Amino acid sequence: MRKRISAIIMTLFMVLVSCNSGGVAEDPQSKFLKSVIDLGNDFLNVFTSFGDIVSKVLGFSTETKKSDVGAYFKTIQDTIQGTKDKLNKIVTDMKREGNPNASATETAVKTLIDNTLDKIIEGAKTVSDAIGDASDPIANVAAQNAAGAAGTEVDKLVKGIKTIVDVVLKGVGSANAGDDKKAEDGNTARTAAAGDGEAGKLFTAGAGAAGDANNAKKVAADAAKAVGAVTGADILQAMIKDNGDAAKLATAQNAGAAPKDGAIAGGIALRVMAKGGKFAGPSAAADDAVTAIKGAAISAITKALDTLTIAIRKTIDAGLKTVKEAMKINANDTPISPEQNTPKATTNN
């Protein structure tokens, strides 16, 4: 009997609240709780929207165009901009609602935007603009007896990637990773001027620079060895090193010293991205070698951008957690609607 009475009282209470909601101003405490719930939902949306980047696998292949890489960086730019806009909206809403944590949240958001988001946006835009609408394939190898090409705006690629890497991968990876040994025997060092059978021949100007079928296979094997010996972070660090061997190779310059695996892999990744960039081809028919060169090129760019994507995500997540702490909400909880918080009357037959 007592349970029935409790249920009736609860039902009457809910009816009363429902009736008052139409003509009486919302209770300040209820309004604040609803505001917190809304903030939680907004915050979850920030995490979800940024997670869309990671969910899109970089399925690069021999059919992938350089413009697709540019589109990847444009996606990074747009998504981070969206994250920035949503965070600013949260701060605006908190101020409007008189949330006591608005000031602390505004400070945390400003720090995240100034030190991280704006720099990633800037770097991604620089890279995307440098690649533009380049329709040539990423694994672009010159035809038999044809010359390779450095492509254009490699300096802007380096600048843009550096702007991002300095934020999300500072101190991670090494531009000098790997060794300078040729794949042919694992003991003989490469040469600064790129001798026959060395991966450096891929960047050499001149028709058929990769050599005859036999040497072209060695070149391909050395390139594959270099890419396989280093991490994505190593490749990225090699790409952005000031006056580094990777950038020199990518622009068809003499590295000045026997290039290590990291420099070779970084140079390959830059040549892959550069508008008009093309690897030197063989001087004779060497289909197997060309296929292997393309494979090394795809592997290098995939390694680099996979690592970059994950690093961006981790960096943003860490920044968002700082904002969450300032907001005094648990971003790990699934936000719920006000209706889900409303107690329901129960009956006991």
From Swiss-Prot:
It is a lipid-anchor. A lipid is attached at C19 (S-diacylglycerol cysteine). It comes from the Bacteria. GO terms for cellular component: cell outer membrane. The keyword Signal applies. Keywords: Cell outer membrane, Lipoprotein, Membrane, Palmitate, Plasmid, Signal. InterPro entries: Borrelia_lipo (IPR000680). Residues 1-18 form the signal peptide. A lipid is attached at C19 (N-palmitoyl cysteine). Disulfide bonds: none annotated. It is found in: Cell outer membrane. The Vlp and Vsp proteins are antigenically distinct proteins, only one vlp or vsp gene is transcriptionally active at any one time. Switching between these genes is a mechanism of host immune response evasion. Belongs to the variable large protein (Vlp) family. Gamma subfamily. Genes for both Vlp and Vsp families are on (usually) unnamed linear plasmids in B.hermsii HS1. This is Variable large protein 19. The gene is vlp19.
